[in-house]
Amino acid sequence: MIGRLRGIILEKQPPQVLIEANGVGYEVHMPMTCFYELPELNQEAIIFTHFVVREDAQLLFGFNDKQERALFRELIKVNGVGPKLALAILSGMSATQFVSAVEREEIGALIKLPGVGKKTAERLVVEMKDRFKGLSGDLFNSVSDIPLTSPANVDNRVGEPEAEAAAALVALGYKPQEASRMISKIARPDADCETLIRDALRAAL
C-alpha cells in the first residue's frame, strides 16, 4: 500500500495533482481544502495517501497530514459514503469545519455539500460522532468555535480559470449546470482557478 509520497509537483488539475517520486508520476485526488495548501509547481511536496482499488481503477487520495487522512478513512466507513463523496465533503468543508459541523449537529450545513441529502447528513452525525472518540489529535478535540466559512490562502495561477473551476466542481459531484452557475455568481477577472473553487464552495455553505 502507498501511504506517503514525497516528490515534485508536475501538474495541478483540481482536484488532482501529479507528483513525481523516484521517477514515477502519481495522480493523486485531493480535497480542495488540502489542494489549496500545496506548494507551487516544480516544488517538493509531502502527501499522506490512501490507496483505493476498484474493479475498474486504482486511485490515490492525498492529504496534508495524517489526521485529515484518518478522517477520510472514517468517512468512507459510513454507510453510503464512498471515496468520491468523502472527497467532496472534505472539499466543501475543511476537516476541522466538518468535525465541528458533526459535533454541533449542523444538518443544514451538511446537506449543502454535493451528494449529501438529509438522510446522509443525519447518518454522518450519528456515526461520525462516535468515531471521533476513537481518533487522536488536535483535529478531533473540541472545535465548537470554528466557523464554517473560514477562508484558505490561494495564490496559484492557471489558464482559463472559470472553465477549469467549473470542471473541478463537476469532478466533486456537482451537476454541470449547477457548477457553471456557482462559478458565474462569484467570478471576477483577477481570480485564479483555485480562488474560484474556494469561493464557490464557501458561498454554497
UniProtKB/Swiss-Prot annotation:
Region (Domain I): 1-64
First-listed, main subcellular location of the protein, grouped into a coarse class: cytoplasm
GO cellular component terms, A-Z: cytoplasm; Holliday junction helicase complex; Holliday junction resolvase complex
Family annotation (CDD domains): UBA_RuvA_C
Pfam families: HHH_5, RuvA_C, RuvA_N
UniProt region (Domain III), positions on chain: 157-205
Record-level Gene Ontology MF annotations: ATP binding; four-way junction DNA binding; four-way junction helicase activity
Sorted UniProt keywords: Cytoplasm, DNA damage, DNA recombination, DNA repair, DNA-binding
Family: Belongs to the RuvA family.
Notes concerning its domains: Has three domains with a flexible linker between the domains II and III and assumes an 'L' shape. Domain III is highly mobile and contacts RuvB.
Function: The RuvA-RuvB-RuvC complex processes Holliday junction (HJ) DNA during genetic recombination and DNA repair, while the RuvA-RuvB complex plays an important role in the rescue of blocked DNA replication forks via replication fork reversal (RFR). RuvA specifically binds to HJ cruciform DNA, conferring on it an open structure. The RuvB hexamer acts as an ATP-dependent pump, pulling dsDNA into and through the RuvAB complex. HJ branch migration allows RuvC to scan DNA until it finds its consensus sequence, where it cleaves and resolves the cruciform DNA.
SUBUNIT field: Homotetramer. Forms an RuvA(8)-RuvB(12)-Holliday junction (HJ) complex. HJ DNA is sandwiched between 2 RuvA tetramers; dsDNA enters through RuvA and exits via RuvB. An RuvB hexamer assembles on each DNA strand where it exits the tetramer. Each RuvB hexamer is contacted by two RuvA subunits (via domain III) on 2 adjacent RuvB subunits; this complex drives branch migration. In the full resolvosome a probable DNA-RuvA(4)-RuvB(12)-RuvC(2) complex forms which resolves the HJ.
Protein name: Holliday junction branch migration complex subunit RuvA
Naturally occurring in which organism (per UniProt): Pectobacterium atrosepticum (strain SCRI 1043 / ATCC BAA-672)
